[in-house]
């Protein structure tokens, strides 16, 4: 039902075009539009009421809010719901992490403002993780920033690199922020079929040839939310080569890096030689350590994009 409602139909909101549109279609951002206003008279005064907000109007319905409303209605009717929706772990956060938090909050200095890009020790820990897990060397001073979860990191990156009229390539179906971050910045989104092989890369190449203006970035999300599809290093190598050829930025969402079942840990796009020239990757502690409410994530990669 959800696929039919949200993933399987042509988008009906501003700034989105699916890959099944005619190849010579131009994809452009909607024209600038001033908020419509109505005037309500109150005594001798005129009060202006703003009815529309341009950026908010560009966003489609938030799928999780709609699903939650359906679940609430079903539960109110007595249904026993097994929730397979949002990736919201219900396992206990590891005890040593909780104990460290309890110890730390008793120190007055931790309640002051933090460094904007995250405290040095946290960024060094992320650099050590990438070196250990992926064999990727990162400079914690210039290539890592701590974020309020991977979602906030992705949204901020999307808004930092795009301007009204820019075109971004995103998989479909995908996690909402992969579109929302760009739409709210005034950019346009072109959907490509979610795939971990030649089909996706061919769609990227085709979109770069036939989209006006030419796309500036593509989104990768493996392991994929919501499909659980994974990617190989070979796929990433081809994606990086294509991005270099077409002048694209790669934004990779690796929030599910540590959830796998076949003995093959998901790779990072940054393992590919040359990826650091054009890619930024976001990760999260939410899924790895069952800490979604803590809001801790990272954006790592190209120095200029991270800065």
Task: Go through the PLM ranges and name each one.
Residues 190, 194-263:
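Active-site phosphate-binding strand-loop segment of PLP-dependent enzymes
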Residues 160-182:
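Conserved PLP-anchoring active-site segment centered on the Schiff-base-forming lysine
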Residues 46-149, 156:
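N-terminal small-domain helix-loop-helix segment of the aminotransferase-like
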Residues 74-77, 185, 245-246:
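Helix C-cap/helix->beta junction micro-motif
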Residues 271-307:
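Conserved core segment of the aminotransferase class I/II
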Residues 7, 14-15:
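Intrinsically disordered, low-complexity tandem-repeat regions
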């Amino acid at each position: 039902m959800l696929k039919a409602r949200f993933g399987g139909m042509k988008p009906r909101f501003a700034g989105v075009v699916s890959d099944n549109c005619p190849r010579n279609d131009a994809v452009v951002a909607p024209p600038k539009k001033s908020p419509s206003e109505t005037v309500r008279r109150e005594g001798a005064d005129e009060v202006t009421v703003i009815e529309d907000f341009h950026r908010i109007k560009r966003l489609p319905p938030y799928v999780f809010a709609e699903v939650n409303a359906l679940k609430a209605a079903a539960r109110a009717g007595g249904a026993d719901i097994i929730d397979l929706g949002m990736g919201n772990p219900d396992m206990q956060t590891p005890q040593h992490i909780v104990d460290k938090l309890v110890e730390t909050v008793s120190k007055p200095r931790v309640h002051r403002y933090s460094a904007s890009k995250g405290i040095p020790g946290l960024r060094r820990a992320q650099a050590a993780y990438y070196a250990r897990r992926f064999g990727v060397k990162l400079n914690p001073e210039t290539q890592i920033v701590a974020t309020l979860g991977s979602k906030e990191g992705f949204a901020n990156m999307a808004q930092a690199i795009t301007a009204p009229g820019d075109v971004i390539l995103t998989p479909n179906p995908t996690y909402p922020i992969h579109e929302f971050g760009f739409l709210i910045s005034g950019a346009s989104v072109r959907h490509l079929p979610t795939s971990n092989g030649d089909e996706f890369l061919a769609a990227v190449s085709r979109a770069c040839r036939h989209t006006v203006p030419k796309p500036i970035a593509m989104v990768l999300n493996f392991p994929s939310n919501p499909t659980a599809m994974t990617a190989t290093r070979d796929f990433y190598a081809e994606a990086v080569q294509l991005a270099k050829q077409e002048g694209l930025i790669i934004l990779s969402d690796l929030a599910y890096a540590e959830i796998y079942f076949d003995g093959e840990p998901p790779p990072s796009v940054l393992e590919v030689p040359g990826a650091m020239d054009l890619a930024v990757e976001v990760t999260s502690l939410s899924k790895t350590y069952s800490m979604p409410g803590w809001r801790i994530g990272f954006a790592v990669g190209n120095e200029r994009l991270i800065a």
